[in-house]
């Protein structure tokens, strides 16, 4: 986009990556300045612990500070919606509008129930056992193309998800998930301590929740 144009920050869901937004970006005005972020453990960012929800929110807060956002449009999907909310609760000057797509913000009573998940180890979580290796991008495309939810996705979005969601194996042939199963499982098990309600009280920015 064009520096000085309307700023937009796009934050992806758990297990996704910044390039999942490519088809959305293509439909936005070409003179807007658009930023899409790979959260830690996703895309081209490093798999550096901790994978806590507060840490993801703080990471995005630092990104906003580095980019010097002001009156941007903040768009977040799932975990990304949580993080956009976290950032806005700390500094509302970054955004003038929020678009939160299925944001991970639970009913207050559910946070106590979520704490019970802490007894499950990452290794025992079903997501941690997900296949991590693929011989090619096409193999991943073929494996998931007829499965939910991927089979109802726009084809171009699904192709972006696969193409940019894999990294070359460091010590061999083939590809591995940029967001390995153990990282995704760690995030799901960490949502019990992600109570945003103190920050939400600070937010007066107009928001659309989908």
How should these model regions be labeled?
Residues 22, 61, 85-89:
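Short, hydrophobic alpha-helix immediately C-terminal to the catalytic nucleophile
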